[in-house]
């Protein structure tokens, strides 16, 4: 029993493998689990177990994702790996698997390829804060100078998309060689095989370079309003789930979105029909608001720490449009298209003003199955921030998913 408790005391970090198809993301994921399993810090997973990823739904979109977990001496990791390129795009945009950092896998034999670039761009757009690089398939290179060239290319590519290319740790090795060695000697530890040691070096780099994320509870308070009702003689109660931070009775908070920002005081907090002094991130709670009428509050507004979030009507977003097979639209759409944008707890009508491809070229139209960057104008101001996820809906069905990459107005 004591062991389970010990594991919980390690800081938890979410990471994932990204990179071009067939560069070795899944092989590396398997190699990490096999290597750390020798120390009792992971459950060894074979390539096939990870590759046959189960389907999940996130924001109405089906995504195949494999989740593995493992520990290093310092941390507990949840690691996500996707079998197909489209799954990566959907995963990163919906935030189905939020990543605090990513391991970019690049085949040293091939160098950066189109999806390498696309995944780096996506990581930048959706707010994956840190990247560590694994140059894979080193066993296929005879010339060490080639390895240096590939490393240089990768650093330039990272810098191009505003990652600190010169500082990013790059570890070279062979996931397949390490995996085969661990399969033949499951108890092999560090210092006995060069290929296996590369996996340890990679995990050292991840431990050191990817910072422990700020916990939700330490961030400024925010709760999206799901429902509102009045209690005779006591006032108005807004209910919802606290997204981050904490709130205490007697604190001043702001009501943000839809109709301008108002300040109010928390006069009471209730959970499961019991009153409490403090609500924490993750709690489903009722917040009693002083001097606020029921008609002043509606679903889609947020309660937040004063000054921590502001309402906006215009933003840029990175968006994936569902294909017909996924239950999306059957026809393309053009600039001026007006769907609903589902933000936190509510639908808001908005106009898609313009859209561009990765190169910044204006596109004529958007086809089902496309990934696109778009500028959106909402009819009502809503509390929006960078990195926030949203769904695009039409008549109640999801036709796309997106993430705010830049606030404009």
UniProtKB/Swiss-Prot annotation:
Domain tr-type G stretches: 10-214
GO CC annotation terms, alphabetical: cytoplasm
Keyword annotations of the record: Cytoplasm, Elongation factor, GTP-binding, Hydrolase, Magnesium, Metal-binding, Nucleotide-binding, Protein biosynthesis
Annotated region (G1), positions in chain: 19-26
Gene3D superfamilies membership: P-loop containing nucleotide triphosphate hydrolases (3.40.50.300), Translation factors (2.40.30.10)
Region: G3, residue numbers: 81-84
Residues where Mg(2+) binds: 26
Stored Pfam families: GTP_EFTU, GTP_EFTU_D2, GTP_EFTU_D3
GO biological process: translational elongation
Listed EC numbers: 3.6.5.3
Residue segments, region G4: 136-139
Residue span of region G5: 174-176
Annotated segments matching region G2: 60-64
Subunit and interaction comment: Monomer.
Protein name: Elongation factor Tu
The species this protein was found in: Gloeobacter violaceus (strain ATCC 29082 / PCC 7421)
Origin organism lineage: Bacteria, Bacillati, Cyanobacteriota, Cyanophyceae, Gloeobacterales
Gene: tufA
């Amino acid at each position: 029993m004591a062991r389970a408790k010990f594991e919980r005391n390690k800081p938890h970090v979410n990471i994932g493998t990204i990179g071009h198809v067939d560069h070795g993301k899944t092989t590396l994921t398997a190699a990490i689990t096999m290597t750390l399993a020798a120390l009792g810090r992971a459950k060894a997973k074979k390539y096939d177990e990870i590759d046959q990823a189960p389907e999940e739904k996130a924001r109405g979109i089906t995504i195949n994702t494999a989740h593995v977990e493992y520990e290093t001496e310092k941390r507990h990791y949840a690691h996500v790996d996707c079998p197909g390129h489209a799954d990566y795009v959907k995963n990163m945009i919906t935030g189905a698997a939020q990543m605090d950092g990513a391991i970019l896998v690049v085949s040293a034999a091939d160098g950066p390829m189109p999806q390498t670039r696309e995944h780096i761009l996506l990581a930048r757009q959706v707010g994956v804060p840190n990247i560590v690089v694994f140059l894979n398939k080193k066993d296929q290179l005879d010339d060490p100078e080639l390895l240096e060239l590939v490393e240089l290319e990768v650093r330039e590519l990272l810098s191009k998309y505003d990652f600190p290319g010169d500082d990013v740790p790059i570890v070279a090795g062979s996931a397949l060689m390490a995996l085969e060695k661990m399969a033949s000697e499951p108890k092999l530890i560090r210092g006995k095989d060069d290929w296996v040691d590369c996996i340890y070096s990679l995990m050292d780099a991840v431990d050191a370079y990817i910072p422990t994320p700020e916990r939700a509870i330490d961030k400024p308070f925010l709760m999206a309003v799901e429902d509102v009702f009045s209690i005779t003689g006591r006032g108005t109660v807004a209910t919802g789930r606290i997204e981050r931070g904490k709130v205490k009775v007697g604190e001043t908070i702001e009501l943000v979105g839809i109709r301008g920002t108002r300040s109010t005081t928390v006069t009471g907090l209730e959970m499961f029909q019991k009153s409490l002094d403090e609500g924490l991130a993750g709690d489903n709670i009722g917040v009693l608001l002083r001097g606020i009428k029921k008609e002043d509050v509606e679903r889609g507004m947020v309660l937040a720490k004063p000054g921590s979030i502001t309402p906006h009507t215009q933003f840029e977003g990175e968006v994936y449009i569902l294909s017909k097979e996924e239950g999306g639209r059957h026809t393309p759409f053009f600039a001026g298209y007006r769907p609903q944008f589902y933000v936190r707890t509510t639908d808001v009508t908005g106009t898609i003003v313009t859209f561009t491809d990765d190169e910044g070229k204006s596109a004529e139209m958007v086809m089902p199955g496309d990934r696109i960057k778009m500028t959106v104008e909402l009819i009502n101001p809503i509390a929006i921030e960078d990195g926030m996820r949203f769904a695009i809906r039409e008549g109640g069905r999801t036709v796309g998913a997106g993430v705010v990459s830049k606030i404009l107005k």
